[in-house]
Swiss-Prot record:
Belongs to the NDUFAF7 family. It is linked to Defects in NDUFAF7 may be a cause of susceptibility to pathologic myopia, a genetically heterogeneous disorder characterized by extreme, familial, early-onset vision loss and described as myopia accompanied by severe deformation of the eye besides excessive elongation of the eye. It is an enzyme of class 2 (transferase). The keyword Plastid does not apply. It is found in: Mitochondrion. Interacts with NDUFS2. One of its GO terms (biological process) is mitochondrial respiratory chain complex I assembly. This is Protein arginine methyltransferase NDUFAF7, mitochondrial. The lineage of its organism: Eukaryota, Metazoa, Chordata, Craniata, Vertebrata. Its EC number is 2.1.1.320.
Amino acid sequence: MSVLLRSGLGPLCAVARAAIPFIWRGKYFSSGNEPAENPVTPMLRHLMYKIKSTGPITVAEYMKEVLTNPAKGYYVYRDMLGEKGDFITSPEISQIFGELLGIWFISEWMATGKSTAFQLVELGPGRGTLVGDILRVFTQLGSVLKNCDISVHLVEVSQKLSEIQALTLTKEKVPLERNAGSPVYMKGVTKSGIPISWYRDLHDVPKGYSFYLAHEFFDVLPVHKFQKTPQGWREVFVDIDPQVSDKLRFVLAPSATPAEAFIQHDETRDHVEVCPDAGVIIEELSQRIALTGGAALVADYGHDGTKTDTFRGFCDHKLHDVLIAPGTADLTADVDFSYLRRMAQGKVASLGPIKQHTFLKNMGIDVRLKVLLDKSNEPSVRQQLLQGYDMLMNPKKMGERFNFFALLPHQRLQGGRYQRNARQSKPFASVVAGFSELAWQ
């Protein structure tokens, strides 16, 4: 959520609003359990004032306001994760998930020449559980990493979540003095003695040999939604319902909008979602990896350019009408991995997307589960491990709903030599762990 761009759309005038002829309803618009009345939340009041002042807003602007508004945003002050929150992520389900990702980063570090230093950068770290599990693996394999200087860099816009992350990962957080010229708003040392810093924007993270992690990050970036009509593509906007006070509705723009430029000329779907912010971040990651090496690993809900309407809300672990009580529920849209691949623009190689159950099986989740089960004599612990495994791997649960996607230097897949410095002159191994069934055989 670090690189958020405005759509460039000007306000629609009253005449244009009056000309919008139809209402659009997406398949996720209603959960079937919406309340009879729309609770008037502070965010709803804010949005209605904004729309009355400037006209209907894009879905992207709606998502941005609802999730990251500095005063009322869902992500800014809420702890929405875990059993008491609105959704649970893979790291909260099983420690094995983070452990295998830690192994993946070490595998890539070894395969690309064992640099004497690297940065671990996570975008949107949640409660810090995932990076904590990864760091535990780094500690357990300290003999392998003993000659490598590691630092952790977290990109987080939520003050509430950054405080939780600090409690999870450090002995004592050390806030910096508020300095407009400093890109770091908090820093400290992890429980294992690794320097850790917090940023609000990926651009502020120091460039260098880095491994980037984005787990359930891209799915909350604002999307523009478009519907194909007899007149061509028309963007979906959010407007005030003239028939019902304190209620929002979807409408279609009466004419083309600038964001239409993001749609592929040969697009065959009737409804598409595009995320310019995701493209900006992928471009940044690609440039960094091409220049200084490393890799990026993305794990998220998504598809490879096949799905249409995926915009939905979650509240208390249930689907929630995206226009009801804004600010009280998470908003998300599936990641279009084909778009991420295009935005890499050939600067780096890409792998995936592949299903989560395939990636984790290739990473050795079955072996790791057996080791943990053999070590545990507690029935409750064993049951928890098995339930976590089922949630991660079952195709009807997370196994096929989540995908893994990676960005790597071209040399990594070509078996060539890495030319950045002499310390990394060994040929790359062409097999990439997780993306090949041969990875651990």
